[in-house]
Curated annotation (Swiss-Prot):
Pfam families: OTCace, OTCace_N. L-ornithine binds at N166, D230, S234, M235. It comes from the Bacteria. This is Ornithine carbamoyltransferase. HAMAP family: OTCase.
């Protein structure tokens, strides 16, 4: 059956069927190949796209701007909107929907991007919220397909760290939809929400996926095709929480030893970035000097190893985001 996503918003992979996700991945592969061959499209020619950011970003902004421009769109970047302050989300959505053909939102609440989509009248794309990160997952799956050389349904992906965060949940949603084996690996005190686990396990009955939580590193990583992690602390959080968080998560740091425990020399290391993997950032140095905390979630050796595909992931943000825009707002 043909897939038609015209006019659809892209808020979470939970809204999409496996066939629709497959369509977006296939389109991403195609657009990337054309880009490499110097062939740019015009699917968004004459279209206007607005990027609405509450949270800063390097990859998301660049991916949307480059992807839209390469398909012929004009892009506006907004960081100083009065949305939710002097103007309601509903009113902002209606105004932007009159001027733009697509709206990207990167911010805090999932309810905000959902409210925008409800009232805008044009496709709204989730560039990240505290609850989800669907565009990142498309890039991750594209990268896995490029490097693992087998179907997603045969992939075992282990996310290690704080398994309650948006990346863990977003990967879980995608894995459940695409029939993958997903393991959330971390301390029991940072276990995913039980309701979300049950919801994903229900999806899995239809797709053949396996979704599970483990606190045992040796058992969880055995046979893994992918080890994935994310930063442990987010700026803006209460610093008094950091020592306990780091203590809890240090056993789940991605090390060469952990990679070796997979028993698979080709296990991929993945990370959505930014990463604390060395001491070459002000934040990492500050945490070390001022609080005596090593917040590095991955060893530098692993981050820079041949198993690491983190910069392929970063590039693939553009190709997959371009695919989402073309599929939903293109001509």
């Amino acid at each position: 059956m043909a897939v038609n996503l015209k006019g659809r918003s892209f808020l979470t992979l939970k809204d999409f069927t496996p066939a629709e996700i497959r369509y977006l991945l296939d389109l991403s592969h195609d657009l990337k190949a054309k880009k490499r061959a110097g062939i740019l499209g015009d699917s968004l020619k004459g279209k206007n796209v607005v990027l609405l950011f509450e949270k800063t970003s390097t990859r998301t902004r660049c991916a949307f701007e480059c992807g839209a421009a390469e398909e012929g769109a004009h892009v506006t970047f907004l960081t100083n909107s009065q949305m939710g302050k002097k103007e309601s989300i509903e009113d902002t959505a209606k105004v932007l929907g009159r001027m733009y053909d697509g709206i990207e939102f990167r911010g805090f609440k999932q309810s905000t991007v959902e409210e925008l989509a409800k009232h805008a009248g044009v496709p709204v794309w989730n560039g990240l919220t505290d609850a989800d990160h669907p565009t990142q997952i498309l890039a991750d799956f594209l990268t896995i397909e490029e490097h693992a050389h087998k179907p997603l349904s045969e992939i075992k992906l282990v996310f290690t760290g704080d398994t309650r965060n948006n990346m863990s949940y977003a990967l879980m949603y995608g894995a459940a939809k695409m029939g993958m084996h997903f393991v959330a690996l971390g301390p029991d005190s940072l276990k995913p929400d039980e309701d979300i686990l049950k919801e994903m396990q229900e999806y899995s009955k239809e797709t053949g996926a396996t979704i599970e939580f483990s606190s045992n590193v040796d058992e969880a990583v055995k046979g893994a095709d992918v080890i994935y992690t994310d930063i442990w602390v987010s700026m803006g959080e209460d610093e008094s929480l950091y020592p306990e968080r780091v203590k809890l998560l240090t056993p789940y740091k991605v090390t060469r030893e952990m990679m070796n425990k997979t028993g698979n020399k080709n296990t991929l290391f993945m990370h959505c970035l930014p990463s604390f993997h060395d001491e070459d950032t002000e934040v990492c140095k500050d945490m070390m000097d001022r609080l005596g905390l090593d917040i590095r979630e991955v060893e530098d050796e692993v981050f820079r190893s041949k198993n690491s595909v983190v910069f392929d992931e970063a590039e693939n943000r553009m190709h997959t985001i371009k695919a989402v825009m073309v599929a939903t707002a293109g001509k």
